Each structure stands twice: as C-alpha cells, then as structure tokens.
C-alpha cells in the first residue's frame, strides 16, 4: 500500500514537472520570406537586409535575371516558393499579371506611389525609376552634335559611333516605346539601322566603359550605370545627354515588385512590399543604386537631374506590356 502511494506521488510530481516544462501553446515557427530578385544583386540584398533588421522577418534572396525568374514563376505555378518578385524592369511583371499569378497590392501601398508607375489593376508597383540617356565621350563628339532624337541613330552617318545592348530589358522597353509612338515600321527601321551601323555590347556597364575608354563615341544606356561607374572611379571623361521634348530616347522605366498570389505568407509579403515603397525603403534602395525614388514627394540625393525636369515620352510602364513585340522584332532583324 505504501509502495503504491509512493509510486502515485512520484508519477504526479513527474507529470506536474512535465506540464510546467511544456508551454501551454507551441510558439509558431518564425516567418521567412523568399524574394526572387531580378534587380541588381546588391540592391535586392540591401533592401532585404534592411527589412529584416526592422521587422525580424528573414528574407531569403534568390538571384536571377528578371525574365528567367518570371518564367520560373510560371513554371512553378501554385507550388512556387517565392513570396515576392522584384524585377529590373516592368514587362516581366506585366506578363505574370496577365496570367493571373500576382496578388492585389494593398491599397495603402498603392497610395504612396504615382498611379502612372503602378499596374492599372494594382497587381505590381514601380519601386524606383530610371531614364534612358546617351552617354558620350566629349573627346570624340561634342554634345551639340548629338542627334535631336534617338531615332536618328539608325542613320548611316552614325556608323561605328553608337553602341547599344540588344539583350538589355531597358533597350527592349525602348523599342516597345518606339512601336507605341512611331509604329512598327519605324521601330523595325530603327533596329535594322542600329544592327547595320552600331556596335553591340554584352551588357550596359561594358558599353559604358567603352565610351569612357574612347572605344566608341556614344552608347544608349540607363542613367544609373554612369553614376555607378562614377562612384567606382571618381571623375569620368564621359558625360550624359538627356533627350527632350518627349522623345522616346528619354523613356522612363521602372524596377518593379509584386506579391505572388501563391505566397504562403501574404501578410508578411505585403509588409515587405510596403517597406520597399516606404520612404525608408526607398532611401535604402537609392543609396545603393542611382535611381529615382517613386514614393510621392521624395527626391534623389545622388545628384541626378531632377525627376521633374525629365521630358519623357507619354508612355507608361503599363503601356509597355510584356515587351514580346519588341523581342519578336529584334529576332526578325537578327539582333536577338
């Protein structure tokens, strides 16, 4: 009898100890987001790190090209591990939006951005903007001798004097803008002329360095590459020329982001998107790359030409669609 009582007391004490040692409710696993980053690596890494420091939410960054990651999302469908996709340009997100793979952006996030730089249906947002420019070497050409329109670069007189990057998403966006403004025939003539008389480069920084080193007089690039090279080297020999009067040479394009409809953590994914659009997030991004913040009322502190002074064509990122027509046209003329 005494043995049974002792055993009973021992079991009671043991069970009580286990109960006290076990939490009443199991703590939920910490949320970890996956970002598919088609933007430049240092940009995606910087904003992910800043968001994690602010919120404690870890962001796993997977780097790839914008088009590659968009195609991966299509292939993965509902099984995609990605929560947010961040692209260097808008056409890949227009493509995903057309296929119904993007979630609606929270209204509060849309409200802090100009409506011209978000999807018409609110499924993606522009994060930062950049402008197409001509980088030129004053030792090889005077600025006054540059063409009034980017369309003139298809003329034989520019043979060997203009460089471009046909595989660049921004170049393809510029080709779409030409289709929208001048028509398909004009765009084909422009691309054909560039192929015949221009110099092609593998990427924008290689092209810019060719101008800087005096290998070619001019190249068509985004403005921020010049500022990146300036940060790396200091004083540059090359300069930037901005087209005016709404010429397609001064097209404004945007890096963009969206939450995937298949996200397993939609609340936290929307929180990350909101951070990217916030003043704090925009500051992190624009300190890493010389692009224009799109948060209403913000200005760049990188010495860029004021955004309000850019004379861009009336072609919005939404107007550019998925850029398939430009890719098809490039293939037709032998550029891609």
Residue ranges and their predicted role:
Residues 38-42, 64, 68, 80-216, ...:
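Extracytoplasmic ligand-binding site segments that recognize negatively charged/polar headgroups
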Residues 10-22:
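Bacterial N-terminal signal peptides
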Residues 28-94, 336:
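Early extracytoplasmic/lumenal segment of secretory-pathway proteins
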Residues 255-314:
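Mature extracytoplasmic/periplasmic domains
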Residues 22-28:
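Sec/Tat signal peptide C-region and signal peptidase I cleavage site
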Residues 1-6:
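N-terminal secretory signal peptides that target proteins for export/translocation
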Residues 91-95, 217-238:
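A ligand-binding cleft/hinge motif common to bilobed small-molecule-binding domains
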Residues 302-336:
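Extracellular/periplasmic bilobal clamshell ligand-binding domains
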């Amino acid at each position: 009898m005494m043995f049974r009582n002792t055993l009973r007391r021992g079991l009671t004490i043991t069970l009580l100890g286990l109960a006290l040692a076990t939490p009443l409710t199991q703590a939920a696993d910490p949320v970890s987001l996956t970002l598919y980053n088609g933007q430049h690596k240092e940009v995606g890494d910087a904003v992910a790190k800043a968001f994690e420091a602010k919120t404690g939410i870890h962001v796993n960054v997977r780097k790839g090209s914008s088009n590659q990651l968009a195609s991966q999302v299509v292939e993965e469908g509902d099984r995609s591990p990605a929560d947010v996709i961040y692209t260097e340009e808008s056409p890949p997100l227009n493509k995903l939006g057309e296929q119904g793979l993007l979630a609606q952006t929270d209204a509060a996030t849309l409200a802090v951005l100009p409506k011209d730089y978000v999807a018409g249906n609110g499924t993606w947002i522009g994060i930062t903007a950049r402008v197409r420019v001509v980088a030129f070497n004053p030792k090889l050409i005077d600025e006054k001798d540059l063409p009034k329109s980017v369309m003139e670069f298809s003329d034989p007189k520019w043979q060997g004097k203009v460089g471009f990057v046909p595989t660049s998403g921004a170049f393809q966006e510029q080709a779409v803008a030409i289709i929208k403004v001048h028509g398909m025939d004009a765009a084909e003539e422009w691309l054909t002329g560039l192929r015949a008389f221009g110099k092609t480069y593998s990427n924008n920084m290689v092209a810019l360095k060719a101008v800087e080193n005096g290998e070619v007089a001019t190249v068509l690039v985004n403005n921020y590459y010049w500022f990146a090279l300036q940060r790396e080297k200091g004083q540059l020999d090359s300069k930037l020329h901005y087209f005016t009067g709404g010429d397609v040479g001064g097209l404004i394009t945007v890096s963009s982001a969206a939450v995937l409809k298949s996200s397993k953590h939609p609340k936290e994914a929307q929180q990350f998107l909101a951070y990217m659009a916030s003043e704090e997030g925009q500051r992190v991004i624009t300190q890493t790359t010389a692009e224009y913040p799109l948060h209403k009322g913000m200005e760049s502190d990188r010495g860029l030409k004021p955004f309000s002074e850019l004379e861009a064509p009336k072609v919005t990122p939404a107007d550019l669609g998925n850029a398939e027509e430009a890719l098809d046209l490039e293939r037709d003329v032998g550029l891609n």
